[in-house]
């Protein structure tokens, strides 16, 4: 018996059996469909594989990035360092594209933008340095989020922020330090912006937590922060020259007197506020005359300090 089905094909109706008499699909059509399916599967697999390979390569690059930073910190040729750092920063940001939640990379980026802006941009182009500090801050705040400080830190009430900071442990110290450092410099370069000045208390709160958790982190950098903080303003505006001197002394003790930026900042901020020309001159002269590689692991910082000290000494008669 024959009958038409809904598709128009003729079928033979047989008890317990169904046999199609429609023309079979060409082998080429079947092959094309199979190839299409296989190609789709392969493309999906390749996409997933490319993603995982990219992340794997990024993770394997972390030790290389760290080694590169160590080598850069040992550099004493300022022109070479100035020309090389931007490429390193873009490399780090490229790795962040693959690993956006990697706190280590975010901290490296924040540190890099801070160092480049402070060492090579700020003295001649404050507006550009401000943008670089802001980029560093964004990376550091992302690292803080990964470390457990969620939410918009800039929008938090100060008391609420302090409560959240109290819950953080030593693992958050690097992110706290670089966030506070970049934030404070960004504020310093935008003093005419009331919104920026209003955030200073939050940057200070972040660095205060660093002091509480590990005051030796990054060569006692938190003490340098507060040495400048207390020394860069008159007492009527919250300055405290004794506290400032004590903070610089603590930073000097942590580094064995080999980190020249300690004397640089004490002369630049505290000695100028105290109108102490002799201290200003003597400290900066000592910075210039001390070999940059007295502290090999921080030779670049020392070379930058020497360069800045020479510029400050050139203005001594103008200020005193």
Stretches with model-predicted labels:
Residues 311-320:
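Extracytoplasmic and endomembrane cell-envelope/extracellular-matrix remodeling and assembly machinery
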Residues 35-41:
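Sec-dependent signal peptide recognition
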Residues 63-94, 98-101, 112-212, 221-255, ...:
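Short coil/linker segments at helix-helix boundaries
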Residues 52-55:
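Bacterial signal peptide processing site
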Residues 217-218:
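Charged, well-structured binding/catalytic surfaces in domain cores that contact anionic ligands
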Residues 1-34:
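N-terminal secretory signal peptides that target proteins for export/translocation
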């Amino acid at each position: 018996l024959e009958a038409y089905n809904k598709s128009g094909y003729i079928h033979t109706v047989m008890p317990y059996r169904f046999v199609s008499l429609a023309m079979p699909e060409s082998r080429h059509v079947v092959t094309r469909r199979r190839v299409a399916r296989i190609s789709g599967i392969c493309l999906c697999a390749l996409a997933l594989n490319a993603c995982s390979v990219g992340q794997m390569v990024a993770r394997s690059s972390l030790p290389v990035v760290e080694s590169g930073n160590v080598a850069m910190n040992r550099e004493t040729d300022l022109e070479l360092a100035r020309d090389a750092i931007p490429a390193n920063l873009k490399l780090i940001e490229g790795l962040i594209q693959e690993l956006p939640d990697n706190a280590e990379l975010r901290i490296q980026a924040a540190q890099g933008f801070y160092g480049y802006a402070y060492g090579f941009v700020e003295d001649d182009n404050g507006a550009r340095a401000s943008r670089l500090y802001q980029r560093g801050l964004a990376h550091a705040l992302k690292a803080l989020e990964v470390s457990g400080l969620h939410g918009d830190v800039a929008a938090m009430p100060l008391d609420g922020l302090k409560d959240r900071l109290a819950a953080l442990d030593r693992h958050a110290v690097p992110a706290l330090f670089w966030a506070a450092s970049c934030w404070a410099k960004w504020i310093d370069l935008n003093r005419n912006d009331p919104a920026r000045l209003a955030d200073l208390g939050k940057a200070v709160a972040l660095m205060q937590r660093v002091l509480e958790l590990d005051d030796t982190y990054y060569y006692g950098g938190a003490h340098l922060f507060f040495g400048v903080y207390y020394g860069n303003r008159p007492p009527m505006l919250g300055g405290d020259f004794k506290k400032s001197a004590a903070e610089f002394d603590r930073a000097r003790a942590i580094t064995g007197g080999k980190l020249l930026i300690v004397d640089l900042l004490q002369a630049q901020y505290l000695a100028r506020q105290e109108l102490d020309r002799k201290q200003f001159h003597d400290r900066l002269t000592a910075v210039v005359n001390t070999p940059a590689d007295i502290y090999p692991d921080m030779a670049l910082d020392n070379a930058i300090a020497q360069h800045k000290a020479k510029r400050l000494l050139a203005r001594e008669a103008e200020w005193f």
